Amino acid sequence: MDILFLFLMVIGFMLIGVPIAVSLGLSSILFLLMHSDASLASVAQTLFNAFAGHYTLLAIPFFILASSFMSTGGVAKRIIRFAIAIVGWFRGGLAMASVLACMMFAALSGSSPATVVAIGSIVIAGMIKNGYSKEFAAGVICNAGTLGILIPPSIVMVVYAAATDVSVGRMFLGGVIPGLLAGVMLMIAIYIAARIKNLPKQPFVGWKETFDAAKDASWGLLLVVIILGGIYGGIFTPTEAAAVAAVYSFFIANFVYQDMGPFADKQNTKPVLVKIFQTFVHKDTKHTLYEAGKLTIMLLFIIANALILKHVLTEERIPQMITESMLSAGLGPITFLIVVNVLLLIGGQFMEPSGLLIIVAPLVFPIAIALGIDPIHLGIMMVVNMEIGMITPPVGLNLFVTAGVAKMSMMNVVKAALPWVAVMFLFLIIVTYVPWVSTWLPTTLMGPEIITK
């Protein structure tokens, strides 16, 4: 009954307009003061232990910084050019190229909103110019942008790994096949819609342009090889990989592509050595660091408040109570996965993915292990639910970002995204009930997961 009061407080604060992160933290602290035997000092200890014990959380600010440099530079334009060269000659090819570009940029950014902004700000106008409706273009980008948290490296996967103590490397591998499958399913749906609506196709650009576009985009796409190759080659940990990614992104944006900083200013005639030193204090670098810092603080503030709620639930033994009640009720794996999907789909409509995972993952993880469900399978399924949550109202983040990029009303974006959400629901069913889609690659390359807790 006390826990019901806690969740009513959280919902009540949200309804009166209190930010979600503050609602989680404030409700938890008030609950501790009024209903729990635990002290507030234990909250501070829990937060310290959570961040000190989860070294992988340090990857989040570095991945955000890498994403910021990649978004600020002209990487997105080069990726879009390459994607159009590959699939643009199909009917509906420009929309399919948008999905492919989102898939490639997702592998660089690890963030859905960043993917929508970087790709959508360029291709939506191009699609409209080539005979696509604004609604069609916005709906495609809104959904394809969600691949930013499914295709590795992914910030949300790092959060899940930290919340459940599973391997970040396994989670990244687990997202490869589902990410490719989701992108292919969206492109097939676009092709079918294009045939029905007789949408335009681009002429084949030729092999020379294809190779030139690939060469131009290769410096940016090499980041994926560095991150994943470095992790699975044993060169560095996921956290170190994130730091390397940030440094590499800074180097590529400033010195190779020269899309920002003093090298982008053609009127700057100072010696090269002077320009190199100017790069580190240039206004573009400062602005990128500032924006990445703002996003990092916002995300970690949400995670910190979610950790307080997680602490309260743990103190009240809620995970153990839920596990015991579900197992004693004879709940099987199929029914359990349905319950988790429904819970996450509802929660994803109101909460940011990282905060929701911090709360829900520790609750359902022990039950999943007891039922013999692979932790990587569970993690990828939860990430897919977060994808759908980002494109469903009332607070789906991708909906707001797409509305801003496409200059459309929120309701029009919701209507535009709805047909493609059906594709994502079909994809969720596949990921939920065909576990090898997410477990085959990590098991093949790294062996079976060993649970130690």
Range-by-range predicted roles:
Residues 1-453:
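Alpha-helical transmembrane segments of multi-pass membrane transport proteins
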